[in-house]
Amino acid sequence: MAIGFICSSPDAELFSEKSRMSSSVLLGCLLCCMDWSAAVPGKTEPFRKLFDAIMIKKLKSCSAAYPSDLDEGSMCDMADASPTSLELGLSKLDKES
């Protein structure tokens, strides 16, 4: 499922750096981001689009922040991927609806 999401994402260049990136690191980053979905159950399609955009952004910053760790397959530190960004996005969605 995670690989399917990445391959089908509008940002397919995530895989263009495949030689640099360990799939376990990428999967680890994705799973950290996906934990957010449990915080806000039952949201609609606009929420999923926002959520996907946040995930892609976090994956890119994760791969950029830890280039030396990627070959070793270590887990990215996603502590800064707090629900704050998600909450800001959700409040924007609430205002639009």
Swiss-Prot record:
The UniProt record lists the keyword Signal: yes
Key words of the record: Cytokine, Disulfide bond, Signal
One Pfam family it belongs to: U83
Entry's Gene Ontology molecular function annotations: cytokine activity
Recorded GO CC terms: extracellular space
Keyword presence, Oxidoreductase: no
Domain of life: Viruses
Disulfide bonds: C32-C62, C33-C76
Family affiliation: Belongs to the intercrine beta (chemokine CC) family. Highly divergent.
Protein name listed in UniProt: Putative CC-type chemokine U83
Species, as recorded: Human herpesvirus 6A (strain Uganda-1102)
Gene: U83
